[in-house]
């Protein structure tokens, strides 16, 4: 690890930050993590570790116990290789080719104009740093690095029985220091499709592009309760309120880029009679001020644009336009229900994540999350009803299970005691409203004892993503102490 790419390699703990620096230099968005996987395989092989790969593409690395620790229970350190590729509209960045550019910003590390990939790159770096260490005491170690967690949990779905020998799994994909997770929400993707016909834009109409941007966005699980605006829903609300009075014809609607990120930006191309241009401008300006008044405490950066546009496309027919706008406006979004069992935790939510328009159809991609299967089913049923009323089709796919909390977890008790021993107070034991791979690992490995912990990462899945530097040291200290505290096999 002699080649460093940025100033972050000087931070402490040095081995972890140096690995993260290297990770940032190798492109690894979801579905394109092969170069990074290959780098890790080559490095681990050079170190003399036992390295394997399953048919799905997950990477397995084994490190023997340090002397005197051979009888400890085996531990699996786990992270995912891929990162969410999100950039600001004005950032020129190809996630499949260009390195992430991390830099130190006060107490934080962030990236220039893009997601940082601290989710889950810091966790992955911690696993590699344990492998590289010569002075950490630990029992038998396995590292499991999964692929494509962010875009479908492909690696976790593909994990089969027989590949792992450990008794305990430490998932490193949590994002708040001082919290340790023992359960998570399950989820399912929903895709609503509207078949549309088009008519020529009438003579005397002008074409405009309306843009709403500058919203915070964020993770559609961890941030769904924060009251942040959803650009798709907010632009849909404007159309629902004013399309008829403006005699507006919809040409295109596009917004968001990932089903699991709250959309920060949305764009519509519309045609209006030339004499209604001024009215459109007045109403859109008024709506912008309305949003600032409603959301200004949370959304401090709202901006809108109303610009001239040139299009060769035709407009939606009046009937198809009305069906789509009404359905988008009626579609539920955000927190559906808070948990009765765990105070302050979201039970069920929905994110209207991505809208795309093609010549003859519009697609709306949503992600439903819930701690309970019946909650998920209820929101599926609601979406089906909206689609049915609007004459749209809806399909659900990619369901993954939640991770049910285990009150008798031995590793949770060990983590709690270790944490209290270091800091003098207990950690917050939590259930997270997001998809962790642990729920899927329980299927091939039902007896695996698991916890999830990590450093403080703010605004994951958005270009504002940042990791708090001092919490990375705390996370590392906890990892080292935990490995030493693992009990012997019964």
Predicted regions and their residues:
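Zn-dependent metallopeptidase/amidohydrolase metal-coordination segment
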Residues: 8, 13-16, 340, 347-349, ...
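Midchain, well-structured core segments that form catalytic/ion-binding scaffolds
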Residues: 27, 107-110, 150-151, 157-369
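Active-site metal-coordination/substrate-binding segment of hydrolases
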Residues: 69-145, 149-151, 156-167, 207, ...
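His/Asp/Glu-rich mid-to-C-terminal helical/loop segments that flank catalytic regions of hydrolases
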Residues: 162, 228-245, 274-277, 323-329, ...
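Active-site-adjacent substrate-binding region
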Residues: 223, 230-232, 237-253, 405-448
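Substrate-recognition/cap regions that form aromatic- and gly/pro-loop-enriched pockets
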Residues: 345-430, 434
